[in-house]
């Protein structure tokens, strides 16, 4: 009975200081003991992920050892492992994972911490992960995550997202797949992402966009705008008749 309770992160060894390296170590042990998502542990995992984001944001400004531990244990790989599961409750946990990632990247201020987070390519693996976009919450937090990442783009960080050797740019190519999404907030986010990308002065990246994506994306964008102009024209004509 006691082992079962401990397995799901019983509170006996939980550090009293919520924002501390010790608490992050405790939460890491929770992830280690709950590598498979189930209906029984999904609530625990969601709460752990939420707390991890809070500790990392605090550590970014107050204690560099927090990020050192997060990177040493490669905790982003645990996030990706959870995302790739199809077990019961995994979609529910995916929503929290995307929330956690969005909060983390939105609030991180230390450039070194940001570079460390982006350096092992796990963020790109998360971007190309096949999420269940039929879930509105997953769709919403995914596109918000991409938008948050796009706000971090500059001449230095672009190299973490655009790979010149493989000529690949997942942040951009995955985002523009949703340019014509039925939800207006998703479409607006996609426009914001593309504009944030175009602002970065990287010749090879801009050449990639022109060669690989410009024709299908901009032709579809023009068609989309034209379609709405015709619909507006029809509405005006009906009102005047």
Residue ranges and their predicted role:
Residues 2-174, 178-241:
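Elongated alpha-helical scaffolds that mediate protein-protein interactions in large eukaryotic proteins
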């Amino acid at each position: 009975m006691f082992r079962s309770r401990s397995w799901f992160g019983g509170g006996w060894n939980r550090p009293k200081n919520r924002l501390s390296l010790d608490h992050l170590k405790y939460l890491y042990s929770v992830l280690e003991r709950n590598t498979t998502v189930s209906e029984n542990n999904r609530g625990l995992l969601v709460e752990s992920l939420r707390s991890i984001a809070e500790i990392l944001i605090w550590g970014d400004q107050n204690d560099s050892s927090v990020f050192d531990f997060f990177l040493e244990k490669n905790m982003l790989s645990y996030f990706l492992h959870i995302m790739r599961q199809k077990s019961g409750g995994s979609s529910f946990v995916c929503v929290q994972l995307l929330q956690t990632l969005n909060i983390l990247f939105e609030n991180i201020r230390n450039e070194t911490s940001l570079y460390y987070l982006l350096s092992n390519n796990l963020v790109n693996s998360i971007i190309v992960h096949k999420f269940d976009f039929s879930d509105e919450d997953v769709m919403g937090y995914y596109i918000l995550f991409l938008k948050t990442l796009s706000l971090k783009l500059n001449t230095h960080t672009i190299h973490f997202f655009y790979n010149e050797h493989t000529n690949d740019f997942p942040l951009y190519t995955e985002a523009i797949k949703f340019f014509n999404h039925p939800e207006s907030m998703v479409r607006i986010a996609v426009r914001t992402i593309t504009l944030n990308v175009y602002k970065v002065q990287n010749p090879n990246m801009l050449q990639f966009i022109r060669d690989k994506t410009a024709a299908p994306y901009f032709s579809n964008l023009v068609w989309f705008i034209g379609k709405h102009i015709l619909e507006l024209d029809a509405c005006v004509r009906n009102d005047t008749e």
